[in-house]
A protein has these predicted regions:
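A composition-biased, non-transmembrane "mature-region" signal
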Residues: 7-14
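Short, small-residue-biased leader/transition segments that mark boundaries at the very start
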Residues: 1-6
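Mixed-charge, glycine-accented linear interaction segment located at domain edges/termini
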Residues: 130-170
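A glycine-rich, hydrophobic loop/mini-helix early in the fold
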Residues: 20-71
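Short, conserved charged micro-motifs
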Residues: 28-31, 77-83, 138-150
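Short, internal acidic amphipathic alpha-helical interface segments
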Residues: 80-118
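Glycine-rich, often proline-containing surface loops adjacent to acidic residues and nearby aromatics
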Residues: 16, 61-77, 123-134
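Aromatic/basic-lined ligand-recognition segments
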Residues: 47-55, 111-130
Length: 170
């Protein structure tokens, strides 16, 4: 689900625009915003992607173009182990198409929340990915960077991390 358009910081590039979206089910209403331990939280993923353009070739990008993205992804508490960051990173990279292969860089953060007091016993886990990459120029229909393909790839990755109720039934 498309949520809103984002605009770039003038310190990053001359031009830029991005989109924010979410995937999943908000079946339990406000349980996601209430926080820890909700089933709804395990079925929501959010993220954004921004396409940046600099008039002058950026040496650190090796291009005029750069994509910057963020995702907050669901994670089953039992899946929170030392292998998780690498698995999420590898899965994410499988969704990229039309990019400079050596240009992908970023971080994966896995969180574990433990509640206390009146919320005692509630735990939840999550994963956050911050990543940037250089898209290939000339892949779009008009011979420029295909921004739509970059957005579709990022959205497909985020959606792939959601477990829907029908998945649980099988």
């Amino acid at each position: 689900e498309f949520r809103r358009v984002l605009f770039r910081s003038s310190t990053l590039a001359d031009y830029g625009i991005g989109v924010e979206f979410e995937a999943g089910e908000r079946a339990l209403g406000d349980a996601f915003s209430a926080g820890l331990g909700s089933d709804a939280e395990s079925r929501i993923a959010t993220g954004w992607i921004m396409m940046l353009y600099a008039h002058e070739l950026r040496i650190d990008w090796d291009s005029n173009w750069r994509c910057v993205a963020f995702a907050r992804l669901p994670l089953e508490t039992a899946e929170n182990d030392s292998l998780t960051p690498g698995m999420y990173w590898d899965d994410m990279c499988d969704y990229f198409d039309g990019i400079e292969p050596d240009s992908v860089s970023g971080t994966v953060t896995v969180t574990q929340n433990t509640a206390f007091g009146s919320m005692a016993g509630s735990t939840s886990a999550g994963c956050e990915i911050r990543v940037s990459w250089t898209p290939l120029d000339g892949t779009g229909p008009d011979g420029t960077m295909d921004a739509g393909a970059q957005v579709r790839s990022w959205a497909a990755f985020i959606r792939s991390t959601i477990r829907f109720e029908e998945d649980d039934a099988s």
